[in-house]
A protein has these predicted regions:
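Conserved mixed alpha/beta catalytic, RNA-binding, or beta-rich assembly cores of soluble enzyme
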Residues: 12-18, 25, 34-36, 44-99, ...
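Donor nucleotide-activated moiety binding/catalytic core segment of transferases
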Residues: 41
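Extreme N-terminal starter segment of soluble prokaryotic enzymes
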Residues: 1-5
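C-terminal non-catalytic interaction/assembly regions of soluble proteins
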Residues: 237, 241-296, 300-306, 310-314
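Conserved beta-strand termini and adjacent loop/short-helix elements that scaffold enzyme active sites
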Residues: 30-33, 116-118, 264-266, 307
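Extended alpha-helical regions
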Residues: 303-334
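Polybasic, low-complexity association/targeting segments
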Residues: 6-11
Length: 334
């Protein structure tokens, strides 16, 4: 986690420097070196994973207020008094990791962590915190409150997952008899009214004609996601045949999504075990009967999720890496 610390006094600066030994990050003091509260906050809110104010909570609240957008994207914000007595997460307690950070900082300086999120205060399962620990994206953040609200009301919430989850479900959580009955679900292809948690384990296999533009690939990818219900946030990498390694459109498409892209030879793709959609035409052009499916499986080291999908001269497939979710996500439970 990339932290940024801001202090307001010499005493606060000393504490910030101490804390940065535990949770590394930049340390600044307001009023020194041209640092202003508004300027520092604007810069770090966009760049850092966590903002740590060593000073009054009111100052921190007023500083971050103009920048708050969404619990899905806002950084963690924690405030400590300059004496190191209390550590209070103010923003993104679960998804941003502010609760965990406050506890770590408190342990480093002997402070009391002041955790105010309702599930934590009541000792209940926090679905968004668990999702973060499992490397899952929350697909519909407004639905978090329905799961948490049910638990707070003493109800049992049901989950569905195609992957086995290690450990014992927390109190108030049980497996749904049918996936359609789940209150929250682990899936790459969200459908229905549940809260969907998307594992970031997907690899996109790509096949395309020479000269295919990034815009064409983007349009085809949008159609692929729509027609298969694939959540694009679950894709973290792309793969293709080495004949495409210098295709500007493909490289730009992957770069725009922040995906690393790997390229394999026809021989490497032919060696991938499994049953794939075969094409004589593709075999004649590339030396292997299928590019997108084989490339996705090879790069993922896992299994095929979505078979070949063709759209305007582009083919896509999706595979998933091995995934092992665990109910024992807290450090003291592992």
């Amino acid at each position: 986690m990339n932290c940024a610390y801001l202090a307001f006094t010499a005493k606060g600066l000393a504490l910030a420097q101490q804390l940065a030994q535990t949770c590394p990050g930049s340390v600044s003091r307001c009023g020194l070196g041209g640092v202003t509260l508004a300027g520092w906050t604007a810069q770090q809110f966009a760049a850092a994973d966590a903002l740590v104010f060593v000073g009054a909570a009111g100052i921190a609240v007023r500083a971050i207020a103009p920048h708050c957008q969404s619990k899905a994207t806002d950084p963690a914000v924690v405030v400590l008094d300059e004496c190191g007595r209390f550590a209070v997460p103010l923003l993104s307690g679960h998804l941003g990791g502010a609760n965990d950070l406050a506890c770590r900082l408190a342990a480093a300086c002997g402070a009391v962590p002041v955790i105010t999120t309702a599930t934590d205060a009541n000792g209940l399962f926090a679905v968004d915190e668990w999702a973060k620990k499992q490397n899952c994206a929350v697909w519909e953040t407004p639905r978090i409150k329905f799961v948490s609200g049910a638990l707070l009301a003493g109800k049992t919430v049901r989950y569905a997952s195609p992957w086995a989850i290690a450990g014992t479900p927390p109190a108030g959580v049980a497996e749904a008899e049918e996936p359609s009955d789940a209150d929250f679900a682990l899936t790459m292809t969200p459908q229905g009214n549940a809260l969907h948690l998307i594992p970031r384990i997907g690899v996109l296999g790509v096949g395309c004609k020479r000269g295919t533009t990034a815009a064409q690939l983007e349009a085809a990818f949008a159609a692929f996601c729509t027609d298969t219900n694939l959540a694009p946030v679950g894709i973290t990498a792309a793969a293709s045949i080495d004949l495409k390694q210098n295709e500007p459109g493909l490289l730009e498409f992957c770069r725009s999504h922040g995906w690393p892209v790997s390229f394999s030879s026809a021989a490497q793709l032919r060696a991938v075990p499994g049953t794939f959609s075969a094409s004589r035409f593709v075999q004649g052009v590339t030396g292997v009967d299928n590019v997108c499916e084989r490339a996705a499986v090879l790069a993922s080291g896992g299994t095929l999720l979505l078979p070949k999908y063709a759209h305007t001269g582009v083919t896509f497939a999706a595979a998933v890496r091995p995934f092992a979710p665990d109910w024992r996500w807290k450090t003291d439970e592992a």
